[in-house]
């Protein structure tokens, strides 16, 4: 796999892998710099005669360490050190007996492939977008904040793996690339539509959804056949399944293709957002994102309904009055398809989530995981940039502005939750 060019000494994708490794192992050492100008290093032994050393730009008490690449392979019997790229770094670490354990060769090879692919995917998105400085320069709205997570999980060896998406599918469907796309629509015999909706009955909820997102298709929505929105990739996947093909053959399901408003994938990839719809929607997506296939379960969508009903109780309302700035995006509806035997197929499930920003899509919004991610260029994170803007706006020292930000976060988020 060809390595992509990137800023000298900075590799946030490799950083995720290494920080996960250091969190889960204990035989590494922190070596202080040999002079005031020299960087500290992580010393990671491979054997009695070899080790990897990685210079540190920052050693974090919370384990969010920042490295200065390349890493070096060193031998115990001489002073020579050899610069190594990320692919070789991974191979050397996975060959270590205590890491390899009793894992079969094919398991290790699959893991190594996912790590390398995730590394490449991360840099493909960063280099395609070229907008990190723009993201960092100003407050973000919901759409921008949800698509600002370019690095991924800070403690995962392959945070940007996405099997079986190919390159074209990844660019169309993943938030890393800031895409938008229309939904795909099925017209389904209502006997094969399962679901619930709290404020509106399910038929009315789906009708409103279609009217706001694909009004040109409303002629297909009748008393007996309902329009059901689908993630385009998942729709194609479902149409390959025997149970879905049976519905098509029986005339109980018609594929109407893609139509209507363009939706954007949020940071979770399977949840989609459109400024013009009262609902967001979270789909089952039969794709291995990070390390798990993202399909919903009936148990999960019904749990969302229970929480939405809880939000209508006097106890919840009292909590809301006590913390008026706290709002929860309730998943107060769901839908899915039943096969010819009447069984709900979980691969077809979707949760309908109240769009609290329907009237105010440009409201400043923060996504904590995006705020806290390491900057691809090695500079300020989005959180550090937000604190600097606060410092400038209030004419406060940066340290005091940081305390103000954390206090506001505690007051608005942590206190209501805990």
Segments the model singles out, each with a brief description of its role:
Residues 1-415:
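Nucleotide/phosphate-binding site architecture used for ATP/NTP-dependent chemistry
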């Amino acid at each position: 796999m060809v390595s992509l060019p990137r800023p000298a000494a900075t590799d946030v994708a490799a950083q995720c892998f290494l920080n996960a490794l250091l969190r889960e192992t204990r035989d590494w050492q922190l070596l202080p710099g040999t002079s005031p100008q020299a960087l500290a290093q992580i010393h990671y032994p491979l054997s009695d005669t070899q080790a990897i050393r990685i210079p540190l730009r920052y050693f974090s008490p919370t384990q969010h360490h920042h490295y200065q690449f390349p890493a070096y392979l060193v031998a115990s019997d001489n002073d020579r050190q050899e610069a190594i790229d990320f692919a070789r770094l991974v191979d050397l670490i996975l060959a270590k007996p205590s890491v390899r354990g009793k894992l079969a060769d094919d398991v290790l090879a699959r893991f190594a492939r996912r790590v390398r692919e995730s590394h490449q995917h991360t840099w493909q998105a960063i280099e395609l977008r070229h907008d990190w400085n723009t993201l960092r320069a100003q407050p973000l709205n919901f759409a921008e904040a949800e698509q600002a997570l370019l690095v991924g999980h800070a403690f995962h060896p392959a945070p940007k793996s996405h099997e079986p998406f190919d390159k074209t599918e990844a660019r169309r469907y993943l938030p890393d690339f800031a895409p938008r796309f229309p939904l795909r629509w099925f017209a389904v015999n209502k006997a094969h539509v399962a679901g619930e909706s709290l404020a509106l009955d399910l038929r009315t909820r789906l009708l409103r959804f279609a009217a706001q997102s694909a009004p040109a298709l409303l002629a297909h929505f009748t008393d007996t056949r309902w329009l059901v929105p689908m993630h385009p990739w998942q729709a194609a996947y479902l149409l390959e399944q025997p149970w879905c093909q049976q519905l098509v053959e029986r005339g109980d399901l018609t594929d109407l293709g893609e139509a209507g408003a363009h939706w954007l994938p949020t940071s979770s990839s399977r949840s989609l957002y459109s400024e013009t719809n009262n609902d967001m929607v979270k789909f089952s997506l039969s794709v291995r994102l990070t390390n798990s296939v993202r399909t919903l379960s009936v148990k999960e969508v019904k749990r969302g309904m229970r929480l939405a009903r809880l939000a209508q109780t006097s106890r919840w309302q009292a909590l809301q009055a006590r913390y008026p700035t706290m709002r929860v995006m309730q998943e107060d509806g769901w839908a899915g398809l039943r096969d010819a035997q009447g069984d709900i197929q979980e691969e077809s499930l979707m949760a309908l989530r109240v769009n609290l920003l329907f009237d105010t899509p440009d409201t400043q919004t923060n996504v904590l995981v995006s705020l806290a991610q390491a900057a691809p260029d090695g500079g300020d994170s989005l959180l550090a940039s937000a604190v600097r803007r606060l410092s400038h706006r209030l004419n406060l020292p940066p340290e005091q502005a940081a305390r103000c930000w954390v206090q506001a976060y505690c007051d608005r988020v942590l206190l209501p939750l805990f």
